[in-house]
Amino acid sequence: MKPAFCALALIPLLLAGCATPPSAQAPMSSAAEASAQTALDERISYYANAYDVPESLIHRSILRESGYNPTAHVGPYWGLMQIRLDTARSMGFRGSARDLLDADTNLKYAVAYLSNAYVVAGRNPDHAIRLYASGYFWEARRKGLLDRLRTAQADEPPAN
């Protein structure tokens, strides 16, 4: 029994050798990080204008949902704004769940959804964040706003 226990105790040590040492992992340079952040900010600005949502609200949602990690995947939630596949589909998305890990794709459908939450919330950012996280359908129905909800199917900015 002792030899088997000793062998089991060595497994974590052997597996530790398989890990890439931190020094071998190439960190992103500060210039590359700045460039990536600038590109992301440009896309956020684009979708904020396209869907009439404050950029600050989009940034707040991204920080809350993924901490600006476009490859975040927790349970049924995907990407930068942690949108569910079925929710993205309700906004017109036709791809696979993994496609939502692309930041631009994620923003296109998640900001459309956030835009609806913002309208239903009476343009109150705090309420919009809550509705984004919990869903807005029943409140939109109660307020008679279902006909004002939009999708992201068109490449053109939605009409108001």
Q: Where do the PLM segments sit?
A:
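Catalytic and binding regions of secreted/periplasmic enzymes and modules that target cell-wall glycans
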Residues: 111-150
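Solvent-exposed loop/turn segments at secondary-structure junctions
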Residues: 66-69, 87-89, 135-138
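Short, functionally critical alpha-helical segments immediately adjacent to catalytic or ligand/cofactor-binding
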Residues: 53-68, 110, 129-133
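Substrate-binding/active-site groove segments that recognize
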Residues: 76-93
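Bacterial Sec signal peptide processing site at the extreme N-terminus
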Residues: 12-36
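Second-shell loop/turn segments in exported
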Residues: 29-34, 44-48, 69-77, 94-103, ...
